Amino acid sequence: MYRIPRGDISPARRFIDNKQEGVYPVMAKESVWTKLRRKVDKEFAEELQRQQEMERTAREEAKALEKQQKKEAAIAAYREKRDLTVADFFRIADLPLPDDFADIADHTISDFTADPRRLTPDSIFLYWGKSPISAGDPASVLQMAIDSGCLCVISIQPCTHPHTLLLPDTTDALEGTNRIREAYIKASAYIRSLHKAKVITVTGSVGKTSTKEMIEAVLRQHYKNPLISKGNNNSMFSITRNIQSLKRTTNVYLQEVGAFAPKTIEYSARQLAADIAVYTNIGVSHIESYGSQEALTADKLSLSTFGKPDGLAIINYDDPILMGHSFTQQVITYSLKNPQAMYYAKDILRADDGYTFTLACRAAAEEHPAQIHVLGEHNILNAIVAFAVGRALQLPDAEILAGIASYQPSGMRQNLLQAGKYRILADCYNSSLLAVDNTLKVLDELRLPDETKRIVVLGDVLALGDLSEETHREIGRVCTQHKMDLLIGYGIAIRYAIEEAAAAGMQAHYYADRAEMEAAVRAAVRPGDIVLFKASHGVNLGASMDKLFGTDLNESSAIGHKQFRIEVHGDFEFYIFENSASLKTYLGHDAVVEVPAFVTATVTDELHETEVTRDLPVEKIGKTAFRGNEEIREVVLPETVVRIRDGAFQGSGLESLDAPDSLLSIGARAFADCPHLTTVNLPEATDQLGDAVTENSPQAMIMYR
């Protein structure tokens, strides 16, 4: 039955009432009810959604506020502990605060250092007879501190700085404990303790830096801003500087640690409190200072002894000395090929630019295909330990393997590069018997045309003490097992290696004079040949490499590691190196400038350990030599210059340059942005031009004479 209700109520209300009574109007009215219900449901749902969204927003805002408050509280707590006043530093370092320091006691310090070159007006300087420039006499070191205007000086020697704490009797005769050095270590260890960053250390007689760089390649796949020690900056002084650069947000800190003299690694270990200590091997490097391999080993093991008790020691299973010692931390082993180690390689195949191999993890019964794009099987070992470190940090396997594959050597460590018509294998930052053998293996593996000569230039392995002659003779015998057409030796003890090689029938020649060695290389090398340079850093073989082939590796490294002095001679400011000078900046205002060929300076001959006065050839025109100098129109370069570095004349008023016959290379943008430049006249020998050499110099033409 259908009934249309009457009465003084709305049609919608009557419709709903009828439905509840089971009385329905005509079918056309059904759509009215449906539309109304939809409207009500939609409004209800929208209101519910708005309320839920408001509640969710309120919760998120409250959560964000709480997170921000916690972050601000954490930052405040961190800054309260990290921002040290002078009084705080003396308390942490366990030193007495002199009464006459009252006026600076509440002054916030920027840093503390033993390097007077790095002092600022807010620094504290500590001097106990050792510093990164300890070759200088104490008076000059302390004068640098005074001139810096630093806050105060803590010194073993009298000092005229107005705020000086003099501790002349600083060494305990029985314990050998130096109070100032101990203060330095304690303050550094305190700052380390404020940070949650995982600390990874790398030490060993050979391969520290290349291993560190392989691990770095892995870390950079995962972490945005890991703190990594630069180059081979591995002394306690560099470590203290790095520790002070730690941030609250730093996740991981990778530090190479070097051995120099008894207890130097122990001092570093106490500062670092390593979570992971990586050991490459134990050889005889620096044994001259330690007296025995046992003493050297004991010092290296201190990285674990003073590391975190729940940390890891990752050791080379192939090194019998390491395997013969016990460690205070849990031990992880790695090997090139030994399946008894926890990590090792198998199925190694040579590729065009490196190797493919299977990385096996014995404990987890896993295998991973891996590759590296660098020659030398020892780099596979570096990749294996980098994988072990990544696993210890619980990084994804894909990221670890990608990091290993991305590694490329640089600088003066097994760096294969093209220098004009020649190929160079630069590996002269450090050396040892094992390192020489490894590098010669890389040279063996290079696929070269039959007519290409392999020329090897070797220098001394330093700091061997009584083992020097026998080690160098063994190096000579090792050379006979490798591919080379000519062996050239420069240095002192390297003559023993040349004697052994020559006795075996090799073409081998020894030179005690650097200029004679350079002349021999120049006479022997032909376009297409490859030349290997290998020596301890103190031999400074890289300087000869730069001079002979116009490379920039040695000078860039020296500047980066602050291994130079700056001197002003007339209108010229020079970088002073051991064997050469480089024009840093022209200070004058002349339109026509003639650069001197030589600079007389006193330098340290590291190989012979003497101070000498030399006429240093000006071999490089530096990056800021004439940059932005709009007054110059003509520059005359001497016949000693072999390289014009990046940007040397950029943005200058130079009109033309007639380069000397000695010039071999020009860096990137060297003559860019020079509106008046018309010609750069080059000799045929200049066969290395960087990118964009004359960019934005509209009239400039490069011409060969």
Predicted regions: what they are:
Residues 43-48, 176-317, 321-330, 390, ...:
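Phosphate-binding loop of NTP-binding sites
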Residues 96, 122, 155, 159-163, ...:
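Acidic, Mg2+-coordinating active-site environments of NTP-dependent enzymes
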Residues 27-186, 477-478, 482-492:
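N-terminal leader/targeting and accessory segments in enzymes
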Residues 561-586:
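Short beta-strand/loop segment at the start of cytosolic alpha/beta domains
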Residues 76-77, 202, 411-415, 440, ...:
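ATP-dependent carboxylate/acyl-activation modules
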Residues 1, 10, 24-25, 571, ...:
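Structural signature of tandem-repeat unit edges
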Residues 129-138, 142, 410, 428-506:
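Active-site beta-alpha connecting loops in nucleotide-dependent enzymes
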